[in-house]
């Protein structure tokens, strides 16, 4: 699948990226390169290959040092207020962020 210039303009508009017409050719080439790599990956036969939880688990001699998922500090109203003091805007104990999807 190859993208044309209109496809690139549409993708830029949907992603809310300002892409001047003189840069569309370069973006088109880069996106088409990425799509080509994806097509090559999809062509690889993975039948019978056991899924990995982590890429390093394919090597038996490597031990992963993953930390335990444990609470490291207790949540308190004072701690919440301290963290929210760093936020540009907050409401009802939550961070407010700009809307990114129209």
Swiss-Prot record:
Name the Pfam families on file.
GatC
* Record SUPFAM superfamilies: Glu-tRNAGln amidotransferase C subunit
> What's the subunit arrangement here?
Heterotrimer of A, B and C subunits.
What is the protein named? Aspartyl/glutamyl-tRNA(Asn/Gln) amidotransferase subunit C
Q: Under which main EC class is this enzyme filed?
A: ligase
Q: What is its EC number?
A: 6.3.5.-
Please give the Gene Ontology molecular function terms for this protein. asparaginyl-tRNA synthase (glutamine-hydrolyzing) activity; ATP binding; glutaminyl-tRNA synthase (glutamine-hydrolyzing) activity
Q: What does this protein do?
A: Allows the formation of correctly charged Asn-tRNA(Asn) or Gln-tRNA(Gln) through the transamidation of misacylated Asp-tRNA(Asn) or Glu-tRNA(Gln) in organisms which lack either or both of asparaginyl-tRNA or glutaminyl-tRNA synthetases. The reaction takes place in the presence of glutamine and ATP through an activated phospho-Asp-tRNA(Asn) or phospho-Glu-tRNA(Gln).
Q: Which Gene Ontology biological process is one annotated for this entry? A: translation
- Gene behind this protein: gatC
Query: Which catalysed reactions does the entry list for this protein?
Result: L-glutamyl-tRNA(Gln) + L-glutamine + ATP + H2O = L-glutaminyl-tRNA(Gln) + L-glutamate + ADP + phosphate + H(+); L-aspartyl-tRNA(Asn) + L-glutamine + ATP + H2O = L-asparaginyl-tRNA(Asn) + L-glutamate + ADP + phosphate + 2 H(+)
Key words of the record:
ATP-binding, Ligase, Nucleotide-binding, Protein biosynthesis
Q: Which residues form a coiled coil?
A: none
Question: Which InterPro entries would you find in this protein's record?
Answer: Asp/Glu-ADT_sf_sub_c, GatC
What protein family does this chain belong to?
Belongs to the GatC family.
Checking PANTHER family in the record gives: GLUTAMYL-TRNA(GLN) AMIDOTRANSFERASE SUBUNIT C, MITOCHONDRIAL
